[in-house]
């Protein structure tokens, strides 16, 4: 069963507290250092994928090949080598005249569950003089399974869960969930029509973007009519329309493995303030 999840977000404004810090800068002149490009990164494991690359950088290019070892650190890792992943090689070589190389990792797709978040730590084995203390010789690789995308997986009967319905059920809703029907838009690519989404008689559309397996985003066209004010609030506050669009604060996303969509939305109506919801 497909699922669409929307959760009521607090109406109050959230304040972010910023703390000051001192930054310590280190300069160098033609010094050679080798390091992972990121200390933590997430990678998609795809069904038809050969290897994904964990980048390693050097501060300078040399006129000779440089080879370094790659060690797997068990502490802090929950992925198992040989079960969840395998390295192409336990060494990397930065070619003469170049400043980068990759540790190539094969994610073992069939052994990773859709809900798994598996990580392991890699360490560069290299001479001390090329290890820059400002950065680290280690990186954590996090793997997420990304199933093949098919827009039809998000069509058909669908259970909608929304905390908005707990606060504003209107005259028809009696729980946080609704059973609705979804279908592929007849002309717009990757667009889904949600029939009677939160209130009967009001359809909305969403668009799925499968371009980045790590960030499978969902967008909505602006100013779609979610419901009429009288049915939801019991009174007409203005033009009797409640509009819905993307939340400017949070990204909406979908999951091809578990066939669900999580929508962060913003409601607009004649009221002292709009409400952010998910």
PLM segments and residue spans:
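Bacterial N-terminal signal peptides that target proteins for export
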Residues: 1-8
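C-terminal motif of bacterial Sec signal peptides marking the signal peptidase cleavage site
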Residues: 17-20
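Single conserved hydrophobic/aromatic residue that forms the stacking wall/gate
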Residues: 269-278
């Amino acid at each position: 069963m497909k699922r669409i999840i929307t959760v009521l977000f607090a109406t109050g404004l959230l304040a972010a507290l910023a703390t000051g810090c001192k930054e310590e800068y280190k300069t160098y002149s033609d010094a050679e250092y080798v390091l992972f490009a990121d200390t933590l990164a997430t990678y998609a494991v795809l069904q038809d994928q050969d290897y994904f690359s964990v980048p390693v950088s050097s501060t300078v290019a040399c006129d000779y090949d440089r080879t370094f070892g790659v060690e797997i650190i068990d502490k802090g890792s929950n992925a198992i080598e040989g079960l969840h992943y395998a390295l192409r090689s336990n060494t990397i070589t930065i070619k003469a005249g170049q400043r980068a190389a990759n540790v190539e990792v094969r994610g073992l797709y069939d052994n990773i569950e859709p809900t798994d978040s598996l990580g392991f730590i890699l360490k560069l084995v290299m001479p001390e003089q090329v290890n820059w203390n400002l950065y680290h010789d280690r990186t954590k690789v996090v793997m997420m399974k990304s199933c093949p995308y098919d827009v039809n997986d998000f069509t058909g009967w669908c259970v909608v869960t929304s905390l908005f319905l707990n606060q504003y059920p209107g005259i028809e809703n009696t729980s946080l969930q609704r059973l609705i029907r979804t279908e592929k838009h007849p002309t717009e690519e990757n667009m889904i029509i949600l029939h009677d989404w939160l209130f009967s008689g009001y359809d909305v559309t969403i668009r799925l973007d499968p371009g980045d397996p790590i960030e499978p985003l969902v967008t909505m066209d602006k100013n779609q009519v979610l419901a009429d004010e009288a049915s939801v609030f019991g009174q007409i506050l203005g033009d009797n329309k409640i509009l819905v669009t993307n939340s400017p604060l949070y990204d909406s996303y979908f999951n091809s493995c578990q066939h669900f969509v999580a929508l962060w939305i913003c409601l607009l109506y004649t009221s002292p303030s709009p409400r952010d919801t998910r």
